[in-house]
Swiss-Prot record:
Zn(2+) binds at C145, C150, H152, C155. It is found in: Cytoplasm; Nucleus; Nucleus, Nuclear body. This is BTB/POZ domain and ankyrin repeat-containing protein NPR1. GO terms for cellular component: cytoplasm; nuclear body. Residues 561-586 are annotated as: Disordered. One of its GO terms (biological process) is systemic acquired resistance, salicylic acid mediated signaling pathway. CDD domains: BTB_POZ_NPR_plant. Salicylic acid (SA)-binding substrate-specific adapter of an E3 ubiquitin-protein ligase complex (CUL3-RBX1-BTB) which mediates the ubiquitination and subsequent proteasomal degradation of target proteins. Pathway: Protein modification; protein ubiquitination.
Amino acid sequence: MAHSAEPSSSLSFTSSPHLSNGSISHNLSCSGSESVPSLEVISLSKLSSSLEQLLIDPGCDYSDADIVVEGIPVGVHRCILASRSGFFRELFKREKGSSGKEDRPKYCMSDFLPYGDVGYEAFLVFLSYVYTGKLKPSPVEVSTCVHNVCAHDACRPAINFVVELMYAASIFQMPDLVSIFERRLLNFVGKALSDNVVPILLVAFHCQLNQLIDQCVDRVARSDIDDISLEKGLPDEVVKKIKILRRNYQQDSDPNLPPADPLHEKRIRRIHKALDSDDVELVKLLLTESNITLDEANALHYAAAYCDPKVVTEVLALGLADVNLRNSRGYTALHIAVMRKEPSIIVLLLTKGARASELTSDGQSAVSICRRLTRPKDYHSKTEQGQEANKDRICIDVLEREMRRNPMAGDASISSQIMPDDLHMELLNLENRVALARLFFPAEAKLAMVIAHAETSEFAAPSSSKGSSGNLMEVDLNETPTVQNKRLHSRLEALMKTVRLGRCYFPHCSEVLDKFIDDDLPHLFYLEPGSSDEQKVKRRRFMELKEEVQKAFDKDKAECNLSGLSSSSSTTSPEKIGANQKVREP
C-alpha cells in the first residue's frame, strides 16, 4: 500500500514480482535457500546508504546545483545525476543553468517537462532512487485521500502520484523505473474508477507505453464516460480509438441499437460552443431556434465542468435549468462542480437549490467525491493570515456544513423598511464587517462576495473623510434621490447577502468577526486619536486581538477534529502572533 512504512527496496527491481502501490520487495537474499546476504550485496547496500546521506543529512550538503520544484529548491549533485540519467548528462553538457547562490547553477522543473507534471514529493522519491537504487514508499500525505473508508489502493491521489513518478522516469530517461511504474499503473487500471483511468491513459500516451495504452483504451471504451469528457481530456488520436472500439462493443451487445440523431447532437454541440465562448445570449438564441432545452443539452453540467463561474451564474439566471438534473451518468451539476473543485460554482449551485445529499449511481455523495479527490497535504495545509485557503479544504467544508443544516432560506428583502439615516449607518457597518472578513479570512470572504455580487473597499476607520464605503456615500449632483436610494438599497442587499452566506457556510469565521466587532472594534476607534502612550496601548491591544482570532480558530478546529468534521483554515500561526494569554482592557 502507498502509505505502508516499510524499508527501501533492494538494488534489483526488475526481477521482483512483489509490487505494491508504494514500494517493492526489499529481500537482499540471492535465492530462497540463502539466509545470509553475500559480501557483494552487503557492500552495495552500504554504498547505497552512504549515498542516501547526501540527500537526507543536512550535515552532508555538498550539492553543486539546485532544481526548483513547486517553488522549493532541491540541492543535487550533477555528477550523480549525470552518471545515472542520460537526460541530465546531456543537460549538464549543454547548459549551466541560471546563477543561484554562490554561482551554483539553478534549474526549474517546469522547464524540463514537455507534458505532465512532477511535484516536489514525487521528485524526491525519484531522486532517492537515482542516488540509492532503492525505491522509497510513497509519502502518505500525497498518495492517499482524506476519505475515511478508502483503501487508497486506486483513489485519485494514489494514481496521480504514480503518474507523476512515471513522467519523471520517462522524461529523465530511467527505463528501469519506467518498467516498475508501468506495471503499477497496469494494476490500477483494473481497480480504479473509469474517470481515474483517464490520467493513466494520458501518461501512457505521452510516454508511448503501448501495452498500457491498449489496456486503458479498452477500459474506457467499455465505460459510460461521455464523448465530450473524452474530447476535453484526451488527444484526438486516442479519442478516435476509443470511439471505434466503443461502437464495436455496442454493436456486439445490441445490433438493433438505433444510431444517434446527428442533427440533435449538432445542436447540442453548438450550445456547448456558445458556452465555451462565454456567450449566454447566443445560447438563448440557439434555444429559441431549435427544440433543444438547456436540460437536454446538459448545459448546466457543461458550464459547471468547463466554464467560468460567471457563465454558470448567467446560465442559472436564465431560470431554464433543473439544478438537480442528472446526466446520462447519474451526476448532478453539483457532482460535476465538486470533481472540478471550484468553490464558487459549488456555492452558486447550493444557493440555487442544489441538494448536497444527492447520491451518484454508485452511491457517492458530493462530499464523498470531494474527499476521494483531496490529498491530506492539501486538506491539512496551514494558511497564513492574508493568504487564500486551499480550495480542496474549502470545498469539503462547504459541502459538510450543507449536509449538516437545512437548505438556506430565500433572501427576504428587508432593506426597503430601513429609514434613510439608518440605511447609511447599516451600510457603514456592513462595509466594515465585510472588509474585516477580507482581512482575517480572505478566501472565505472572497467566495461569499462573489456569490453575492458584492465588492467592498479596504477597511477604514470612521475618522476617514469618506467613510469605509468610499465613494458609495458621496453626493452626485446628477443623481436624483430616487436613483441614489435605489443604488444604496441594492448595495445593502448585496452586503447583507454576503454576511448571510458567511454565517451559513463559514459560521466559525462569523463568530470571530462578531466577537471582534462587539467587544473590540469600539476600543480601536476610541484609541485612534491620542498621545504616543495611547498609541502604544492601541498597538498592544491589536496584537492581543490577533491572538484571540487564532485562539478562537484553534478551539473550533479542535472541536471539529474530535467530531471528525472540519472548519475554516484561513488564519495565521500562533507562533507568529505572540503570547498565548489574552489581556483584557480594564
